A protein has these predicted regions:
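Extracellular/periplasmic catalytic domains that process cell-envelope and extracellular macromolecules
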Residues: 14, 27-29, 60, 104, ...
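Short beta-strand element of the alpha/beta-hydrolase
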Residues: 30-40
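N-terminal cap/lid segment of alpha/beta-hydrolase-fold proteins
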Residues: 1-32, 157-164
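Serine-hydrolase catalytic-loop signature spanning alpha/beta hydrolases and amidase-signature enzymes
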Residues: 41-43, 65
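Catalytic nucleophile-loop/oxyanion-hole region of alpha/beta-hydrolase
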Residues: 46-48, 53-55, 68-106
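Primarily recognizes the serine-hydrolase "nucleophile elbow" in alpha/beta-hydrolase
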Residues: 90-167
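A fold-wide structural signal in alpha/beta-hydrolase
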Residues: 33, 59-69, 110, 148
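Alpha/beta-hydrolase active-site loop signature
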Residues: 41, 70-74, 156-157
């Protein structure tokens, strides 16, 4: 997802590199792309339980899906979603950059996510013009705007972002 040595805000407790997995349908019915972000409370990424099954389902319907394996666990001493938000913005830009070579429409990209991924979906959709990180290469000149968003049981959305019920 990131060029070597250029990933922003790397944390020592984050145990893997973020990456994308493209799911290409055998019989495409659209040139649109669905980006998928799994949940896991920003403590882990439930990729196998949430992103993968949805990607396979969309492929059966003829739609290309791209699953994002974002950084976990959450950063130490910072906002729980920061690393994941950076990875989501970068993922959208990477998908947009690669779409034409794959015969897909770079202006028809949506995002969906579950739980913490639903929160990340809302962050990506409503903060596309707010950079989550400083540009690292040419890809970051591309917009990370989206054409649709599907937050599915988004965590933290109706609270102050705390891990416990909102008391304010």
């Amino acid at each position: 997802l990131w060029p070597a040595g250029r990933m922003p805000d790397r944390q020592p407790n984050q145990n893997y590199e973020p990456y994308l997995v493209w799911y290409i349908p055998e019989k495409p019915t659209t040139k649109a792309i669905q980006v998928i972000v799994a949940g896991g409370g920003y403590g882990f990424c439930n990729y196998v339980g949430e992103a993968e099954p949805v990607a396979y389902y969309l492929n059966q319907k003829g739609m290309t899906a791209v699953a994002v394996k974002y950084r976990c666990p959450r950063p130490q001493n910072g906002p729980k979603h920061l690393s994941a938000w950076q990875d989501a913005q970068r993922a959208i830009r990477k998908v947009r950059a690669e779409a034409p070579a794959r015969g897909l429409d770079p202006n028809r990209i949506g995002i969906m996510g579950f739980s913490a991924g639903g929160h990340l979906t809302l962050m990506a959709a409503t903060n596309a013009k707010t950079p989550a990180y400083a540009p690292v290469d040419e890809i970051d000149k591309l917009p990370c705007t989206l054409q649709w968003a599907c937050p599915i049981y988004p965590a933290y959305a109706l609270t102050d972002g705390a891990d416990r019920p909102n008391t304010t």
